[in-house]
Amino acid sequence: MNPSPLLDLIDSPQDLRRLDKKQLPRLAGELRAFLLESVGQTGGHFASNLGAVELTIALHYVYDTPEDKLVWDVGHQSYPHKILTGRKNQMHTMRQYGGLAGFPKRSESEYDAFGVGHSSTSIGAALGMAVADKQLGNNRRSVAIIGDGAMTAGQAFEALNCAGDMDVDLLVVLNDNEMSISPNVGALPKYLASNVVRDMHGLLSTVKAQTGKVLDKIPGAMEFAQKVEHKIKTLAEEAEHAKQSLSLFENFGFRYTGPVDGHNVENLVDVLKDLRSRKGPQLLHVITKKGNGYKLAENDPVKYHAVAKLPKEGAAQMPSEKEPKPVAKPTYTQVFGKWLCDRAAADERLIAITPAMREGSGLVEFEQRFPDRYFDVGIAEQHAVTFAGGLACEGMKPVVAIYSTFLQRAYDQLVHDIALQNLPVLFAVDRAGIVGADGPTHAGLYDLSFLRCIPNMIVAAPSDENECRLLLSTCYQADAPAAVRYPRGTGTGAPVSDGMETVEIGKGIIRREGGKTAFIAFGSMVAPALAVAGKLNATVADMRFVKPIDEELIVRLARSHDRIVTLEENAEQGGAGGAVLEVLAKHGICKPVLLLGVADTVTGHGDPKKLLDDLGLSAEAVERRVRAWLSDRDAAN
């Protein structure tokens, strides 16, 4: 670990505030080096944290946290915040089972004012805190720190619209690095990027580079030039306020300050001290560089948005992509990405839509091959779904590639704009089930429950890679809204067909014939069901569809077996197991049923296998639970 004499003194923001302002740049260097070491060993979100070091230091230096509230949007950039708030010695546990969460978490620290993981919530939450403090007579300050990527979401503008009309002391810090995970899209980033002050800063840098050597040789010339430079910057900022800022943020009722260099920590402190003394809604526009201080991340912030691990020797570079890699099973995301390109090559009506998740959803190749049919709508899940509905109305075949956890954000659009009109939109729902290190904010544990109650909706859950392709092809051709949900990571290693074969909608298959116990399994839980079935001599049904569910198969299994076990990687409440119980009740069948799913609890973060075992859904845990259930029933009889 690199020496960090200043950082070693800090266990809380109170310690930070004892430092002289002139020591803060050195502290920023130490903190950035610590991040390189810690994230290099544990993995995690990387480039965004490197870009937020100086801003985080300045905020905690000026604001009286935890009395004053810092609300981080998304939370990707919260590692420096955690280091400065007493968690430095726990950073080696980041995103690991039982360790620090990868996002701010209220139960983890009093400095984590609001739990996050999804984008664009910070302004609304900070506004709520500011209103509460005003009602209670507290002299606190609330600060929302939001990136320009998150600012593209409608929720952020809803909060701005509301806050600007209120007499509350609220600061919104717009951390503008021209990125979300991928480069930003839409009109707002272009608006911010066209900033006159940015152009002026670039001009000044050029002039300084070309004249600096000459001015150095003239006594007093450099000092005079610096004063002129400062005056030009001031005039440019004032002109910018009049020309652009007044037309957007100030018309929302915010007093605009900026743009400010987000890596000049001393100047940030001065600006924030001034803003803290002001009344009413304020917006500070800060310019930062994602990955700042680490050249590889600066040059490729998408690749370095999150990393697994970095080499130990100074965390100097990522492993070379030219090194030979063992042939691995394809991930479900890769299976989807290949299917999408194959399908698009055969059908010019196919349109792919993603809400700012090009890489994560497997759309990189599609964008390269079919740029005119690729739409990244930004962090705007609601718009993505309604946009797809409009396309479907005119005969196009939209495919919305979206994570399960983010589909929750567009529920009304699913119902109102798609299902009630029975529009044929295909939702490729990635990251269904447990996701691991990102924890409960990113777990896809509710989609079966909230999708199967929607009229007209087809809901499918593949058990392996080949079935994923089959169900994608099947649901794409359906004249109805459909969702195919699949987990993160690799599957079972099943060979994947290159064809476009389909299966009958609403029909499952028997994967194993057994004795008196029937396993009715959905999606990712088919594999553990098969692993256990041989030991318990159980029949295994791969249901494939949650809606329409295969009533005929369920009834046949219930009548030919003494006991039924349902298995799903989804919440038990309202899930696939509940659908099985509804079928049994409808047909007047009374048989013992054990529902195996995720209980009514908030899951943790860490290794997915460990989490599944804790939830009773690993193969070993399923065997234990079923054996105990069978034993209890035998004892009762």
Swiss-Prot record:
Cofactor binding annotation: Binds 1 Mg(2+) ion per subunit. Binds 1 thiamine pyrophosphate per subunit.
Entry keywords, A to Z: Isoprene biosynthesis, Magnesium, Metal-binding, Thiamine biosynthesis, Thiamine pyrophosphate, Transferase
Cofactors (names): Mg(2+); thiamine diphosphate
Pathway: Metabolic intermediate biosynthesis; 1-deoxy-D-xylulose 5-phosphate biosynthesis; 1-deoxy-D-xylulose 5-phosphate from D-glyceraldehyde 3-phosphate and pyruvate: step 1/1
Any one GO molecular-function label of the UniProt entry: thiamine pyrophosphate binding
Enzyme Commission number(s) of this protein: 2.2.1.7
Domain of life of the source: Bacteria
GO terms for biological process, alphabetical: 1-deoxy-D-xylulose 5-phosphate biosynthetic process; isopentenyl diphosphate biosynthetic process, methylerythritol 4-phosphate pathway; terpenoid biosynthetic process; thiamine biosynthetic process
EC class name: transferase
Family, as annotated: Belongs to the transketolase family. DXPS subfamily.
Name of this chain's protein: 1-deoxy-D-xylulose-5-phosphate synthase
